[in-house]
UniProtKB/Swiss-Prot annotation:
Its cofactor is Zn(2+). GO terms for cellular component: BRCA1-A complex; BRISC complex; cytoplasm; spindle pole. This is Lys-63-specific deubiquitinase. PROSITE patterns: MPN (PS50249). Monomer. Homodimer. Component of the BRISC complex, at least composed of abraxas2, brcc3, babam1 and babam2. Interacts with abraxas2; the interaction is direct and may form a heterotetramer. Component of the BRCA1-A complex. Both the BRCA1-A complex and the BRISC complex bind polyubiquitin. Residues 33-176 form the MPN domain. Binds 1 zinc ion per subunit. GO terms for biological process: angiogenesis; cell division; double-strand break repair; protein K63-linked deubiquitination; proteolysis. Keywords: Cell cycle, Cell division, Coiled coil, Cytoplasm, Cytoskeleton, Hydrolase, Metal-binding, Metalloprotease, Mitosis, Nucleus, Protease, Ubl conjugation pathway, Zinc. PANTHER family: EUKARYOTIC TRANSLATION INITIATION FACTOR 3 -RELATED (PTHR10410). It holds the Pfam family BRCC36_C. Zn(2+) binds at H119, H121, D132. It comes from Danio rerio.
Length: 287
């Protein structure tokens, strides 16, 4: 319960002692986030694509009058720097994401824009680090409704010895004291969809190509060093080939199998719908 220095009519608060009260009540620009299940699927596939480094992407959607962020699709970004505790992208990709949001807005006739970002936390807690909180605060300076999503993966439950994935949504607010920021957890709801949307399907198919480009960029950057001896270059080439094969086995293969299964499922649905159409046509003709 919040402490108040003055109370009127039992309930009306005039002055709160804690700055956090006003922060939560007035400064929070977003009430909740609705993440569509097909966009959630792409985020999960992206987060699980690599166990050693963090990955990052941008969320495309809209904000309604009730201050609820609706995330309809995501854009997978190619990393310019791969580390286990942080991820960096180029400004050109942010500009390209804004252009993609404008294209989706024209295609759907809805006010689509970049409404948030997501990244993974492999093997660590789902809660944002101080770097994440500062990054989120920087984004909110440009857009108060901007949100951050974190997917914590490759976490083992100590009791059941099974893997689990945790996710959260947050924003940043000014801390009670000092110039630092602190996180506010935003309620997030996954909205079920019977089928995957076209934009999310394109993002899912794009994932193997982006991962391959990242490996190629890393290999070319190292291979261009002039001081490497031939044995080292051969070794680096072998590592590059091994990484590509691992991606094909862990990402491209399962994705292809999933797409083939979805295609077969769609064919069966078409057959079922055609039979229903014939029955309805016969019933209509009998009237």
């Amino acid at each position: 319960m919040w402490k108040c220095s003055t109370v009127i009519n039992k309930n009306k608060l005039i002055k709160a002692e804690y700055h956090t009260f006003y922060t939560l009540l007035f400064a929070m620009a977003v009430n909740a986030v609705h993440l569509e299940s097909d966009a959630f699927l792409v985020c999960m596939n992206h987060a699980l694509s690599t166990e050693k480094e963090e990955v990052m992407g941008l969320c495309i959607g809209e904000v309604d009058t009730n201050r609820i962020v609706h995330i309809h699709s995501v854009i997978i970004l190619r990393r310019s720097d791969k580390r286990k505790d942080r991820v960096e992208i180029s400004p050109e990709q942010l500009s390209a994401a804004s252009t993609e949001a404008e294209r989706l807005a024209e295609m759907t006739g809805r006010p689509m824009r970049v409404v948030g970002w997501y990244h993974s936390h492999p093997h660590i807690t789902v809660w944002p680090s101080h770097v994440d909180v500062r990054t989120q605060a920087m984004y909110q300076m440009m857009d108060q409704g901007f949100v951050g999503l974190i997917f914590s993966c490759f976490i083992e439950d100590k009791n059941t010895k099974t893997g689990r994935v945790l996710y959260t949504c947050f924003q940043s607010v000014q801390a009670q004291k000092g110039s630092e920021y602190e996180r506010i957890e935003i309620p997030i709801h996954v909205v079920p969809h019977e089928a995957i949307g076209k934009v999310c399907l394109e993002s899912a198919v794009e994932l193997p190509r982006i991962l391959c480009q990242e490996e190629q960029d890393t290999y070319r950057r190292i291979h261009s060093l002039t001081h490497l001896d031939p044995i080292t270059k051969i070794h680096n080439g072998s590592v590059f080939t091994k990484n590509l094969c691992s991606q094909m086995s862990a990402i491209s293969g399962p994705l292809l199998q999933w797409l083939e299964d979805r295609l077969e499922q769609n064919k069966q649905s078409i057959i079922t719908l055609q039979k229903e159409k014939e029955l309805l046509t016969q019933e209509l003709a009998a009237l």
